[in-house]
Amino acid sequence: MAVSAIFSQDSNSKRLLIAFAITTLFMVTEAIGGWLSGSLALLADTGHMLTDSAALFIALMAVHFSQRKPDPRHTFGYLRLTTLAAFVNAAALLLIVILIVWEAVHRFFSPHEVMGTPMLIIAIAGLLANIFCFWILHKGEEEKNINVRAAALHVLSDLLGSVGAMIAAIVILTTGWTPIDPILSVLVSVLILRNAWRLLKESFHELLEGAPQEIDINKLRKDLCTNIYEVRNIHHVHLWQVGEQRLMTLHAQVIPPLDHDALLQRIQDYLLHHYRISHATVQMEYQHCGTPDCGINQAAPADGHHRHHHHE
């Protein structure tokens, strides 16, 4: 690992740790304040801050575990733990949303007294904490770490939750209309639900070793046949992801090359540069696949592909 990469990882870890500590501290403070003031909006925003803490923790663990080398028992390393943590966090957040909405409906029809002043103070403090965390995560001009960017987006979305709690507090202080509290708590819960559901689907997809959603495997197979002359057919394609690393195995029927290793390198380079697949295991075959399972993930070149090949 290059020295610059090591310093970058250390910088990411420090910033994520600071943001995680601040967010978690204010999450606990907001939960206590919401319970004491009777504000469901604050409790809903606490759930939203929990999504931020979870996202920051996952990002922090991803940076940490990505520096661990694989061992004989964990040949891909430990990056799958972050995916498992994301799945558990998302499932817990969905449960929190259900509880908040249930309580909001109950509160709307049976209003409770809400202490507007403590609610407003805590909401403002939470907003300032989120602004500071967002600034910490975005500090630096050449930030490229996808985990840090994703965590920053979570914090940014939580700003809306803090603003919602502030609006509810101001309305209660000026008009005494307490139903605004459960109404805004439901709106905040919708934000939580959207993030939690997306996280649940993505983590579940990765745990099932699904292919990265942004890669069209049919297009990938055709691209290999079209852009690499010797490749006649692609089949037995398997693509999955561990953390941020994409892995692939495939069988390629090829014209017998003069240099086997050079052709293999060209295929792997193409997958790396066009699809960011950093680890590809390619089995090259000189005969057409004739076994019953050859149709699995199989692609033949376009009709016009070999018409453009000229043989001396």
UniProtKB/Swiss-Prot annotation:
<keyword id="KW-0997">Cell inner membrane</keyword>
<keyword id="KW-1003">Cell membrane</keyword>
<dbReference type="InterPro" id="IPR027469">
    <property type="entry name" value="Cation_efflux_TMD_sf"/>
</dbReference>
<dbReference type="Pfam" id="PF01545">
    <property type="entry name" value="Cation_efflux"/>
</dbReference>
<feature type="transmembrane region" description="Helical">
    <location>
        <begin position="153"/>
        <end position="173"/>
    </location>
</feature>
<keyword id="KW-0862">Zinc</keyword>
<comment type="function">
    <text>Involved in zinc efflux across the cytoplasmic membrane, thus reducing zinc accumulation in the cytoplasm and rendering bacteria more resistant to zinc. It may contribute to zinc homeostasis at low concentrations of zinc.</text>
</comment>
<dbReference type="InterPro" id="IPR050681">
    <property type="entry name" value="CDF/SLC30A"/>
</dbReference>
<keyword id="KW-0406">Ion transport</keyword>
<keyword id="KW-0813">Transport</keyword>
<dbReference type="GO" id="GO:0005886">
    <property type="term" value="C:plasma membrane"/>
</dbReference>
<dbReference type="InterPro" id="IPR036837">
    <property type="entry name" value="Cation_efflux_CTD_sf"/>
</dbReference>
<keyword id="KW-0812">Transmembrane</keyword>
<dbReference type="InterPro" id="IPR023500">
    <property type="entry name" value="Zn_transptr_ZitB"/>
</dbReference>
<keyword id="KW-0472">Membrane</keyword>
<feature type="transmembrane region" description="Helical">
    <location>
        <begin position="40"/>
        <end position="60"/>
    </location>
</feature>
<feature type="transmembrane region" description="Helical">
    <location>
        <begin position="81"/>
        <end position="101"/>
    </location>
</feature>
<feature type="transmembrane region" description="Helical">
    <location>
        <begin position="16"/>
        <end position="36"/>
    </location>
</feature>
<keyword id="KW-0864">Zinc transport</keyword>
<comment type="similarity">
    <text>Belongs to the cation diffusion facilitator (CDF) transporter (TC 2.A.4) family. SLC30A subfamily.</text>
</comment>
<dbReference type="InterPro" id="IPR002524">
    <property type="entry name" value="Cation_efflux"/>
</dbReference>
<protein>
    <recommendedName>
        <fullName>Zinc transporter ZitB</fullName>
    </recommendedName>
</protein>
<keyword id="KW-1133">Transmembrane helix</keyword>
<feature type="transmembrane region" description="Helical">
    <location>
        <begin position="177"/>
        <end position="197"/>
    </location>
</feature>
<feature type="transmembrane region" description="Helical">
    <location>
        <begin position="117"/>
        <end position="137"/>
    </location>
</feature>
<dbReference type="GO" id="GO:0005385">
    <property type="term" value="F:zinc ion transmembrane transporter activity"/>
</dbReference>
